[in-house]
Amino acid sequence: MVIDWGNGRIQKIEDPSSMTGGVVYRYGNKGSYEVKIWAEELQLIDISGLLLPLSNLYLGNMPRMKSLALNSISDTRKLDLNTFCPNVESINIGRLADLERLEIGNCSRLRSIQIYSNPKLTSIEFGSHPETESLYCSYNGLSSLSLKNLPALRNIDLSSNERLSRLELNEETSISAILIQGCAFQSITDILKCCSSLRELSCSYNKLTELDLSGCSNISELRCEHNQLTRLMVPQGSLLEHLYCHSNQLDEDALNTLFDSLGQVVNPAIYYPTSLRQYRISFNDNPGADDCNRSILNDKNWIVENK
């Protein structure tokens, strides 16, 4: 690997992996420098700093690159990963204060995508990413997102995109976890229709008025608190380890109907002090919380929490 630090010094590094703590260089004089890196053999790059100002971040052809991390960088408005790392498998791009455009459409071997805390990034266009299983894309400025070209997705975290109200998925998916808390969804009915394998859903702090999970027979974790729900439906006989639906608009009938749908928790054997699993529900701060039939939950051995 060869680095031109832009001040007349050129540094050659035979084995970058032997540099404990990475490559560190300190300039004698404050100013703007054009840094160039030649490293076709590199498989990993991690460029991180405390709001390191990089106004023209360009990386040349690195066909063996497998992992890329760019964090805490300012002044970079556009980032094109299509040409320099077509075989990258993992990207971690976070806290780029000025990033407005990101191009990754040709990175077809991506398995893990992490793009977070980029407040000026309002859209992402995905190409064909048939191997991507996890997407962590929180704290950006997104208002809509299409994931139709990511057929292998299993875990999605889009939390805290405060303007996000639209998400497109393939009709049939293997998604097991969706985290969209702190967004602006008014309905996620179309999303749930595509996710029959869903096990975990976190959709708290949105604008939902109805939530129907009756088609998600494997659901085991549900956090839907701080919405405007007047109706909440879960599969008959559901055993959710956590069901948090407090701070909504559920009346007495809606809560009793929900309680009736929940499964029976088996009492632990006398010789075994506690159940291997505990099933918890919170429903306080709902209009029907005081008048609902809590005995239904007691008879089914559910644990009631106040949040």
Where are these regions (language model features)?
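Consensus "Asn ladder" position of solenoid repeat domains
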Residues: 140, 161, 183, 206, ...
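Residues on the solvent-exposed faces and adjacent turns
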Residues: 39, 49, 72, 83, ...
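Conserved hydrophobic position(s) of the canonical leucine-rich repeat
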Residues: 42, 54, 65, 76, ...
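LRR N-terminal entry segment and analogous cap-like coil->beta motifs
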Residues: 9-78, 82-89, 195
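Beta-strand signatures of extracellular beta-sandwich domains
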Residues: 2-4
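Conserved hydrophobic beta-strand positions in leucine-rich repeat
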Residues: 45, 57, 66-70, 79, ...
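A structural signal for leucine-rich repeat
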Residues: 59-61, 79-85, 104-107, 125-130, ...
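Leucine-rich solenoid repeat scaffolds
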Residues: 236-307
